[in-house]
Amino acid sequence: MINKKLGNDFEQELCEILADAGYWAHNFANRKNGQPADIIAVKSGGAYLIDAKVCSYEVFPFRRIEENQQLAMDMWIECNNIEPYFALKCRNEIYMVGYITIKGLIKKGKKQLNLEDMNKYGT
């Protein structure tokens, strides 16, 4: 239950950060059937699909990406939307890593991102 609370708190925090940056941000909180993403953020005609993950152990294992998330993010891209992102919170920093980047790393056999990778691939 602690992980769920950490995740929910991070989703709320990220929505507040996005709103402060001028985005309209909506958190798909309290979803019973499991949505494929946590947040949609819109600004200047661009919509961003974001899944927020807390990385308590300084790694983001790709096994945490669910199949329905991959399918939804692929469809999001096919519909000509902006690339979806994973917002990774690690050591009180937030790293925005693009889904296409992660998908490419998975194809190359990578199993996770460590803190060094988050700094390298994140914005």
Specify the residue positions occupied by each region the protein language model found:
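Helix-rich interaction surfaces within compact, conserved domain-sized segments
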Residues: 7-20, 100-123
